[in-house]
Each structure stands twice: as C-alpha cells, then as structure tokens.
C-alpha cells in the first residue's frame, strides 16, 4: 500500500510547486508539490478502500517516515477516517507523530485526536500535565490545545495548570 501511495505522489509531483511549498514551511520538509485540495482528490480512492479496515498503525508510521510531506497529510486523512477506532493506548503513536517531523500544520490536527483519547481516559490528563513541561515545544502545544473542541467539557483546572506551566516559555 505504501508503494502505491508514494507512486501516486511521485506521478503527480510538481517541482515548482514543491519548492514554493517547502519555502512556505521554512525549508523544513521535502514536498512532492501537490496542493492539499488536489491531494485529497487523489487519495479519495485509497481512503474509501481502507475506510472499513482496522486502523493500520504500521501504514501510518510508514507514511509518517516518508520523505514527502504530503505523505504525512495522507496519514492524517487516513487517521481522520479511522478516528472512531482510536483508543487511549494509541497515545504512544500520536506522541511519535507529534515529535517527529513536527510543525504546526500537522501537530494542530493531531491535538484533536489526543483530545479524543483524553475524553476516553481521564487518566491521560496527567500525561497532558507532563507534556506541558516537556522540553519538546510541540508536546507543550498539544497539552495546551487538546481541549480546544471540548466547549462545556473543558477541564478549566487542568487548562489553568497547563497555561501556568507555560507562562514565559
């Protein structure tokens, strides 16, 4: 499956667009040069084909480790489609995704998945407190943002503790 996706990215690569996309991300990542709307269209068959399957973390991690940034976007689309299958013990895979190839545009998607897990297992709030003092800025960011879709379910005490832990950081 991974080879099929990489082939799809390479067949649709646009070097001029890739350079612009890379520059926008401060040259932190290599791009194939496929804008997100086109990428979503290209991967629709893959997402549909795998939508009824069990979540495949090996595939997600392989995509995450791919050289093209668009592969990480494919992983996030796949994860979004399988979101209902997420379980609290998947926090380790999400942490990997947060701390590897980190940048705002992927981390800000993952934080909602983390939020889902914390709602399933309130014991993960302690992990969010740990992350709030991590040396990794992206774990800190997720600890601050994981509740952003909670509305009335927001735990104001934990939010306050996390914000206080990050004052001046």
Question: Where do the PLM segments sit?
Answer:
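Alpha-helical scaffold domains
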Residues: 1-169
């Amino acid at each position: 499956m991974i080879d099929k996706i990489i082939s799809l990215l390479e067949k649709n690569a646009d070097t001029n667009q890739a350079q612009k996309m890379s520059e926008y991300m401060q040259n932190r990542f290599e791009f194939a040069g496929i804008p997100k709307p086109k990428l979503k269209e290209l991967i629709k068959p893959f997402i549909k084909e795998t939508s009824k399957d069990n979540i495949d973390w090996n595939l997600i991690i392989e995509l995450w480790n791919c050289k093209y940034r668009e592969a990480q976007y494919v992983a996030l689309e796949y994860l979004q489609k399988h979101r209902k299958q997420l379980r609290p013990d998947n926090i380790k895979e999400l942490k990997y995704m947060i701390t590897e190839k980190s940048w705002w545009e992927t981390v800000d998607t993952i934080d909602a998945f983390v939020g889902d897990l914390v709602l399933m297992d309130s014991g993960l709030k302690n992990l969010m407190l740990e992350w709030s003092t991590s040396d990794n800025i992206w774990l800190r960011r997720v600890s601050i943002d994981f509740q952003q879709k909670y509305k009335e379910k927001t735990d104001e005490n934990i939010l306050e503790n996390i914000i206080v832990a990050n004052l001046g950081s």
